[in-house]
């Protein structure tokens, strides 16, 4: 998601490219699965007819409050927002009497309002409680997880989700501090501990970057949510419906790329070679990255990748 160029500023990444790819029928029913501060949603609404509809979803209650109260609230009758993870899309649609949609947009990752608010605990740039939950009403904070997990488990999380080669040393230091009666409870404490444990540093990158990323992904089950959300898209999209995903990390993009590719070709069951191939359900349409001007204006956009696919159902009998 990564909206913003500074504290509490919200510059939506790949805004026009994403919405242009998503909205192919102005009368359609669309879903913004990651509302954030509404950058994509507002542009989607501007492209819909009076008959069009937009369901927005966000697991962060602050995002829902932003859409429903205050000066920035959305009053358009074609718009509705739900507080939920986008992986729950099928149930949310069923509750509204909707079976199929014309498009789903997912803008993956943490947003600038989350990063820039020290109380949310996502960033090492300012001290705050080590929370990291995108939905503070659900689940376990990063501090609570680190207060109970063993060294091997912590190291695996930091290595697998942060691709941090000093994961074992960091985990060892975390557990040693906990056993000494000083568990890490703030972002500042975690950043200082990691800086001491990491022996070599990447130019231009804070040594705590990978550890913070790993814990955030783990605490919010982000990769599982993404996998479930993509499966939900396949279930809910109409033939011709669009799946538009913006990701900011190779772990996320790899999941999206693999999912689209795996459903973009007919598959022959080698155990039954004379049976008809399994249907091709998606067609890849585009892969885009921000241009130089956008990256210059918003450095957080530099790692973004936009992928677009269309549901086809080729090979399925009518």
From Swiss-Prot:
E.C. number: 2.1.1.199
Residues bound to S-adenosyl-L-methionine: 38-40, 58, 86, 107, 114
Reactions it catalyzes: cytidine(1402) in 16S rRNA + S-adenosyl-L-methionine = N(4)-methylcytidine(1402) in 16S rRNA + S-adenosyl-L-homocysteine + H(+)
GO MF, any single term: rRNA (cytosine-N4-)-methyltransferase activity
Location within or outside the cell: Cytoplasm
GO CC annotation: cytoplasm
The protein's enzyme class: transferase
Record InterPro entries: RsmH (IPR002903), SAM-dep_MeTrfase_MraW_recog (IPR023397), SAM-dependent_MTases_sf (IPR029063)
BP terms from Gene Ontology: rRNA base methylation
Residue ranges that the Swiss-Prot or TrEMBL entry lists as coiled coil: none
Protein family (similarity comment): Belongs to the methyltransferase superfamily. RsmH family.
Annotated protein name in UniProt: Ribosomal RNA small subunit methyltransferase H
Organism of derivation: Methylibium petroleiphilum (strain ATCC BAA-1232 / LMG 22953 / PM1)
Gene name of this polypeptide: rsmH
């Amino acid at each position: 998601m990564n909206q913003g160029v500074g504290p509490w500023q919200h510059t939506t990444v790949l805004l026009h490219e994403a919405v242009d790819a998503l909205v192919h029928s102005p009368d359609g029913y669309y879903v913004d699965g990651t509302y954030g501060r509404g950058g994509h949603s507002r542009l989607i609404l501007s492209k819909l007819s009076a008959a069009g509809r937009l369901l927005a979803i966000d697991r962060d209650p602050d995002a829902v409050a932003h859409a429903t109260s205050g000066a920035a609230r959305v009053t358009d009758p074609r718009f509705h927002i739900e507080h939920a993870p986008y992986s729950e899309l099928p149930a949310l649609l069923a509750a509204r009497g909707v079976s199929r949609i014309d498009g789903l947009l997912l803008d993956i990752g943490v947003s600038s309002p989350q990063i820039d608010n020290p109380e949310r605990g996502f960033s090492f740039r300012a001290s705050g409680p080590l929370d990291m939950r995108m939905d503070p009403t659900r689940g376990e904070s990063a501090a609570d997880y680190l207060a109970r997990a063993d060294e091997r488990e912590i190291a695996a999380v930091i290595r697998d989700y942060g691709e941090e080669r000093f994961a074992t040393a960091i985990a060892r230091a975390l557990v040693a501090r906990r056993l000494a009666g000083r568990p890490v409870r703030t972002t500042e404490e975690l950043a200082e501990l990691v800086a001491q444990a990491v022996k070599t540093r990447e130019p231009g990158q804070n040594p705590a970057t990978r550890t913070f990323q790993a814990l955030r992904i783990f605490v919010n089950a982000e990769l599982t949510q993404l996998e479930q959300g993509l499966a939900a898209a396949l279930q809910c999209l109409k033939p011709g419906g669009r799946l538009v995903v913006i990701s900011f990390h190779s772990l996320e993009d790899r999941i999206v790329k693999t999912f689209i590719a795996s459903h973009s070709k007919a598959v022959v069951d080698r155990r039954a070679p004379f049976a008809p191939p399994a249907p091709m359900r998606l067609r890849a349409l585009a892969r885009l990255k921000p241009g130089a001007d956008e990256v210059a204006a918003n450095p957080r956009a530099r790692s973004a990748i936009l992928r677009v696919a269309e549901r086809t159902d080729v090979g399925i009998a009518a």
